[in-house]
Amino acid sequence: MRILLSNDDGVTAPGIQVLAAALREFAEVQVVAPDRNRSGSSNALTLESPLRTLTMPNGDIAVQQGTPTDCVYLGVNALMQPAPDIVVSGINAGPNLGDDVIYSGTVAAAMEGRHLGLPALAVSLNGHQHYATAAAITCRVLRALQREPLRTGKILNINVPDLPLDQIKGIRVTRCGSRHPADKVFCQQDPRGQNLYWIGPPGDKFDAGPDTDFAAVEQGYVAITPLQVDLTAYAAQDVVKTWLTKAGVGGEW
């Protein structure tokens, strides 16, 4: 198995390094990751400037000022030849639960892999301590994919409780929960009197029902949530058509 490994915390982050070491025990791994922390960069793709790479002494490749999406795009199309069999993103320092996935660079890296036609996993730890647990879970999932390929065409978003491996209760297939809208902005002034703004914390949980990723992780289970690139709200198509007709702007012009 040939694995392209990326993240949004940066090429030297502990999560990606622990995971790379674990994966190299049974797979060929190429790390292509941002040269710095790019958390919250979502699916941003660099189009207005060239990208440079730096190969680290251990063979990992850092994309200078690159986003997670840049890294996977370059990794699949230029830097890893032959092309990888799968894209893995993580281990993220902190969870990517509920609608956090909208902003997540970790999830975006996996989404880019899927968009380029490859199976993809995004792996996040609900904390900053037990990276070895998340690495072990990831290896189990990848070995399962080797034995029995999963042909859903979906991304697997994996969130792991920050616990020792022997305290993990199991794995649940979940849906994304949701949060209340975030509304905190912190304003400061620089020495010249100009305002500086800091984005505040995420909103509190709104939907953390028993079948959500929030609930599973809180109860000590690994949450695996299938995600997809296609954002079409199919159930709303007929509703929108009816509304356009009633509003007098539908149909042929």
UniProtKB/Swiss-Prot annotation:
- Gene3D superfamilies listed in its UniProt record: Survival protein SurE-like phosphatase/nucleotidase
Q: What is its EC number?
A: 3.1.3.5, 3.1.3.6, 3.6.1.11
GO terms under cellular component: cytoplasm
Superkingdom of the source species: Bacteria
Cofactor(s), by name:
a divalent metal cation
Enzyme kind, highest EC tier: hydrolase
Instruction: Give the GO molecular function terms.
Output: 3'-nucleotidase activity; 5'-nucleotidase activity; exopolyphosphatase activity; metal ion binding; nucleotide binding
Major subcellular location class:
cytoplasm
Pfam families this protein is in? SurE (PF01975)
- Classification via SUPFAM superfamilies: SurE-like (SSF64167)
User: In the record's cofactor note, how is the cofactor described as bound?
Assistant: Binds 1 divalent metal cation per subunit.
Q: NCBIfam families under this entry?
A: PRK00346.1-1, PRK00346.1-3, PRK00346.1-4, surE
Q: What is this protein called?
A: 5'/3'-nucleotidase SurE
Q: Which organism is it from?
A: Serratia proteamaculans (strain 568)
What gene is behind this protein? Answer: surE
